[in-house]
């Protein structure tokens, strides 16, 4: 199989993750896909292939030189986002895209248009893999998996390219924030690694959000509305008051770059009890801590007004900015930067407005910045990936291996 054939095969597996199951992997389809990948890696003759009960698949491409070299790794995740169906994905290749609207689903009038997604125009003349408008595509992150496997095959077929020992790792449940939780860094055995999980060509990322989740529960008192004066306490109104106390412009839709936010992701409730759920994000660790303190302060303020115990807070950290773990080993960024330039890709170093498995792995002792996989519009029906983007990502992997061996 070539790179494109491999990718088209991979997206046929339904691997949506599900945070509600509390299992690892969170869905059985991920293990089905992992078993398929394991058999493919075996057929390629890779070594030290292991697939554990949690769905973590590791393998080794042995060194083809006697030179003492660091062991490096490439990592991608097998799950797709729970935000949109990944079942019965039906991809289509739009050859030599001409810049016009792409009809994904005529009967439902679902159109991928440059008027809504202007980044399409950056890929005129290229070959785009798109959806049928009814599912996501799964380039996040099956493009990354296809690129890693295809790069390994390329290195096998070109023994003149010298490289050290390379480890590859495919993990479940990145999309629900648990991809690194049971990743055995010691078993993986690398000095450093790269996740192939970025978007547009050139993306090179080693800064991400510090992240926390907050759940605030508001207690009320329900009384027949006809006789409720001075008796009823409506928890929905208290929840609404809390929501309005947070800065209205410090939200995802009003921020970019290094700006942090509070993101209201869920509301449930009735008069008796209501719950609001937030995610809290900031690149700056001090500002991140201040945001958490502000949530705590507002909860205390609600309790001061309505009585102690009216509002209860569950607050937990999710992950931290990997920059502090990458800065001491900036040569791994320099290597990726040089590899991109060597294959004609202009590096675009920027902060991740999110998190990656690599962020958590970095704090577990495996420095792990993120490199582009080439897809765009992740997590929805408008997701697409230019074939040329995937080819460039594959070339970057090969070049990194070559550069590490040349030093």
Swiss-Prot record:
Superkingdom in the source lineage: Bacteria
Organismal lineage: Bacteria, Pseudomonadati, Bacteroidota, Bacteroidia, Bacteroidales
Alphabetical list of Gene3D superfamilies matching this protein: 3.30.70.360, Zn peptidases (3.40.630.10)
GO cellular component, one term: cytosol
Classification via InterPro entries: ArgE/DapE_CS, Bact_exopeptidase_dim_dom, Peptidase_M20, Peptidase_M20_dimer, Peptidase_M20B
Reaction it catalyzes: Release of the N-terminal residue from a tripeptide
Keyword Metal-binding: yes
Binding site for Zn(2+) 2: 140, 175, 379
Protein name: Peptidase T
């Amino acid at each position: 199989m070539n790179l494109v054939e491999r990718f088209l095969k991979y997206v046929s597996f339904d691997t949506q993750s599900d945070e509600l199951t509390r299992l690892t992997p969170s869905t059985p389809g991920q293990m089905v896909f992992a078993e398929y990948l394991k058999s493919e890696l075996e057929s390629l003759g890779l070594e030290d292939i292991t697939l554990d009960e949690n769905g973590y698949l590791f393998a080794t491409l042995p060194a083809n030189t006697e030179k003492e070299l660091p062991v490096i790794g490439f990592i991608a995740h097998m799950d797709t986002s729970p935000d949109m169906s990944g079942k019965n994905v039906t991809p289509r290749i739009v050859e030599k895209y001409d810049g016009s609207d792409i009809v994904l689903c005529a009967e439902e009038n679902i159109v991928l248009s440059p008027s809504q997604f202007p980044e399409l125009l950056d890929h005129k003349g290229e070959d785009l893999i798109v959806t049928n408008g009814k599912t996501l595509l799964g380039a996040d992150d099956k493009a990354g998996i296809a690129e890693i496997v295809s790069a390994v095959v390329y290195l096998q077929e070109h023994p003149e390219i010298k490289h050290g020992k390379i480890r590859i790792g495919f993990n479940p449940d990145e999309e629900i924030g648990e991809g690194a939780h049971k990743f055995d860094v010691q078993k993986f055995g690398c000095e450093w690694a790269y996740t192939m999980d970025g978007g547009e060509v050139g993306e090179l990322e080693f800064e991400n959000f510090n992240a926390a989740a907050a759940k605030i529960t508001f207690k009320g008192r329900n009384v027949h509305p006809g006789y409720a004066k001075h008796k009823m306490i409506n928890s929905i109104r208290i929840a609404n008051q809390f929501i309005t106390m947070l800065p209205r412009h410090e939200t995802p839709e009003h921020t970019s770059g290094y700006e942090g936010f509070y993101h209201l992701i869920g509301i449930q409730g009735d008069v008796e009890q209501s719950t609001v759920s937030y995610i809290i994000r900031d690149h700056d660790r001090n500002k991140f801590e201040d945001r958490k303190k502000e949530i705590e302060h507002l909860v205390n303020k609600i309790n001061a007004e309505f009585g102690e115990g009216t509002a209860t807070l569950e607050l937990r950290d999710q992950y931290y900015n990997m920059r502090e773990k990458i800065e001491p080993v900036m040569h791994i960024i320099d290597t990726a930067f040089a590899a991109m330039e060597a294959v004609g890709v202009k590096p675009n170093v920027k902060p991740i407005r999110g998190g990656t498995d690599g962020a958590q792995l970095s704090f577990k002792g495996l420095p792990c910045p993120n490199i582009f996989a080439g897809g765009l519009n992740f997590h929805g029906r408008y997701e697409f990936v230019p074939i040329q983007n995937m080819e460039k990502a594959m070339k970057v992997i090969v070049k990194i291996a070559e550069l590490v061996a040349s030093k």
